[in-house]
């Protein structure tokens, strides 16, 4: 009897999270990660270690003479990773050649341009008619590698971070941290934190834990916050530790560095933050804060005083989002976009005419039935 009363009083809203979980797992997840920093800091090795895959098997390392005049290039690599029935489409954006030239003036401009181009493409797609299948190519996170051999951030590091800190979530990383003693690591971390504050460079901010979070999560969250900038070591090689256990790490004459040992480096904290706990928040900050900031700047540029008279601005304020002019496309892309929209409008018109014909036919059949 009590069970029957319980069933009658149960509506079923408690099952809503299960619906979202099934839908999310079926759809899969997209994540775009940018890696930047000078060559030789272990960026490729760390990425392969983080995701247990080889994204750089076809890479050719240029000779030292070729690096003298090397220019920065943007490379995009994609891989689908499945774990426990959950699929993640990972897109890695690499920046080979960054900081390798003798003259590094404005070498960060291609990176800024690439990030803004992804915002521009998303804004264009979002303002179009076909909004169901928008491909999100925006950069959700940038791992910026800092040399362990300097005394903090170099002028190039500061210039790059200033140029992108309002466009992407920055996570600073000290590469090849096994070159430092523990005391040196902590001193370098504090120096970098002080410089970031002094230069007013905004890096990714961890959201505050809810009061109802369990204590283990709060402890892990505090450890991750204290680890920034993450001092990491990457390796896909399996070696034997002092207890003859197989571990991923690096063997030296003075001992073994274990990649997944929290006493040796911050690799586990970085992977936990990047994948297990804050991946979705990185995407939300990208959309709700960084992209919206770009979108607002685009709209403000259209309504600057002097660009249009007051009447034009009044008219613009009444326009819908789909009517707002977007950044100019190349002519070929514009013609292609127009053809696609014309074809979509034609299909919608045909569907509407078909529905009207069916309604008229049903109405005629109803009138005939009434006459009989």
From Swiss-Prot:
Residues 27-301 form the Septin-type G domain. Residues 94-97 are annotated as: G3 motif. Residues 355-372 have a biased composition (Low complexity). One of its GO terms (molecular function) is GTPase activity. GTP binds at residues 37-44, 71, 97, 176-184, 234, 250. Keywords: Cell cycle, Cell division, Cytoplasm, Cytoskeleton, GTP-binding, Nucleotide-binding, Phosphoprotein. Belongs to the TRAFAC class TrmE-Era-EngA-EngB-Septin-like GTPase superfamily. Septin GTPase family. Filament-forming cytoskeletal GTPase. May play a role in cytokinesis (Potential). Septins polymerize into heterooligomeric protein complexes that form filaments, and can associate with cellular membranes, actin filaments and microtubules. GTPase activity is required for filament formation. Interacts with AURKB. This is Septin-1.
């Amino acid at each position: 009897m009590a069970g029957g009363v319980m069933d009658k009083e149960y509506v079923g809203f408690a099952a809503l999270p299960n619906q979202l979980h099934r839908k999310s797992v079926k759809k899969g997840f997209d994540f775009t990660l940018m890696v930047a920093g000078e060559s030789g800091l272990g960026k490729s090795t760390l990425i392969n270690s983080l995701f247990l895959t080889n994204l750089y098997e076809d890479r050719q390392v240029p000779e030292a003479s070729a690096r003298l005049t090397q220019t920065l290039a943007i490379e995009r690599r994609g891989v689908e990773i499945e774990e426990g029935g959950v699929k993640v489409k990972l897109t890695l954006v690499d920046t080979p050649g960054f900081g390798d030239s003798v003259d590094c003036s404005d070498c960060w401009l291609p990176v800024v341009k690439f990030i803004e181009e992804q915002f521009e493409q998303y804004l264009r797609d979002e303002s179009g008619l076909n909004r169901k299948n928008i491909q999100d190519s925006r950069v959700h996170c940038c791992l910026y590698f800092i040399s362990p051999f300097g005394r903090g951030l170099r002028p190039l590091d500061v210039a790059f971070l200033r140029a992108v800190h309002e466009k992407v979530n920055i996570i600073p990383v000290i590469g090849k941290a096994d070159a430092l003693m523990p005391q040196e690591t902590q001193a370098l971390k504090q120096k970098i934190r002080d410089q970031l504050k002094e230069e007013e460079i905004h890096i990714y901010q961890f959201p505050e834990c809810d009061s109802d979070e369990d204590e283990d999560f709060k402890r892990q969250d505090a450890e991750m916050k204290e680890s920034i900038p993450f001092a990491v070591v990457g390796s896909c090689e399996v070696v034997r530790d002092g207890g003859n256990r197989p571990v991923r790490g690096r063997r030296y004459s003075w001992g073994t560095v274990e990649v997944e040992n929290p006493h040796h480096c911050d690799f586990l904290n970085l992977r936990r933050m990047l994948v297990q706990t804050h991946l979705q928040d990185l995407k939300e900050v990208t959309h709700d804060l960084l992209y919206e900031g770009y979108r607002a700047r685009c709209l403000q540029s259209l309504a600057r005083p002097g660009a249009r008279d007051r009447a034009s601005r009044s008219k613009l304020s009444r326009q819908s989002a789909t009517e707002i002019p977007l950044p100019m496309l190349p002519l070929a892309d514009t013609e292609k976009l127009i053809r696609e929209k014309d074809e979509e409008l034609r299909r919608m018109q045909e569907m509407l005419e078909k529905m009207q014909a069916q309604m008229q036919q049903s109405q005629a059949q109803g009138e005939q039935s009434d006459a009989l």
